[in-house]
Amino acid sequence: QPQIRIPATYLRGGTSKGVFFRLQDLPEAAQQPGAVRDAILLRALGSPDPYGKQIDGMGNASSSTSKAVILSRSTRPGHDVDYLFGQVSIDQPFVDWSGNCGNLSAAVGPCAIHMGLIDAARIPQNGTFPVRIWQANIGKTIVAHVPISNGQVQETGDFELDGVTFAAAEVALEFMDPAEDGDDGGAISTAPGRPKLARAPSGGSEPHAVGSVGALFPTGNVVDTLEVPGVGSFAATLINAGIPTIFLNAQELGYTGTELQGAITVSYTHLRAHETRGN
C-alpha cells in the first residue's frame, strides 16, 4: 500500500488524551464522513487490536486515550472552529461519533490556535482569548477561555486536576445552553443579553447525532426506575446536559462512593449493572 503522511497533534485535555487532525490535512476521501475516514483514525490509534494494547498506534489501551479529534475553521456565524470527536474502539473496527468528549473540549481552543485555525492577529499578547467552538457531534456551542502569554498559548501553570499527576494552565469552558435543543446551539439565549451556560474547569452518525440533544430530563421525570435483567431495579435520574448521563445512588450498587476505578471495573457483576442498551 502507498504511504501517506498526515500532520497531527497529540494533546491532553482534562483526564483524556487524543490525536488532533486538521480537516484540510486529511486525504480528500477522508474529509467526508465514511469508511475511509474511520479506517484512517482506527489505524492511527492502533485499532482494532485483539491484544487490547494498541502498541502499533497512538492509542494507549484505555477509553480515556483512544480518541480522535478533527478541527476546521468554522463557517458558522459567531464561531471560530468546528470540533468533531470520535471515540475509537480499542478491539473493534468502530469509531463512535455519537457524542462529545468534555475532557478533550479543553484542548480544542489551544489546539486551534496552534494549528493556525484562528487568525494570529486576533490573539492578544497576554491575557485570555475566548475561542468559540461549534461541537458538531451534539450541535452545541462551547467557549474555551485560553490563557495567552507572549502571544502564545500558555501551557504551564498551577492548576491541579484530580486524576492528572502534574499541574498545568487552566482552560475554563462554558457550555452554552447545554440542555436546550435549538438551531442556534446555544449561541442565542431565550433571555436577551443573558445566555444560559454551565461552567466547567479544563480539566452513530455524524456530524450531528440528533438523539444526543434535548430536554434536561429526556424522560420528563426527575427520577426513573431502571430494570436491569438479572440484576435488579434502580432509582435513577437521567440528565442530558452536553452528554447523556445516568445518576444512581452508589449504595444501591453496593458502593460507598469512595472507590477507585479498579475496584469497580474488576467486578463483572457491577459492570453488568452499569451497562445499558438502547433499541
Where are the language model's segments positioned?
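Glycine-rich, mobile lid/loop segments that gate access to catalytic sites or pores
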Residues: 123-236
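Glycine-rich ThDP/TPP pyrophosphate-binding loop and its adjacent helix/strand module
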Residues: 242, 266
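Glycine-rich phosphate-binding loop plus the immediately following alpha-helix
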Residues: 174, 245-252
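Generic N-terminal targeting/processing segments that precede catalytic cores or assembly contacts
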Residues: 1-75, 148-156, 204-208, 223-225, ...
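C-terminal catalytic subdomain
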Residues: 258-260, 277
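Anion-binding (especially nucleotide phosphate/pyrophosphate-binding) glycine-rich loop
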Residues: 48-129, 137
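Short hydrophobic alpha-helical segments that form membrane-spanning helices or hydrophobic packing faces
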Residues: 21-22, 108-110, 247-250
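Conserved small/polar residues in nucleotide/adenosyl-binding loops
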Residues: 269-278
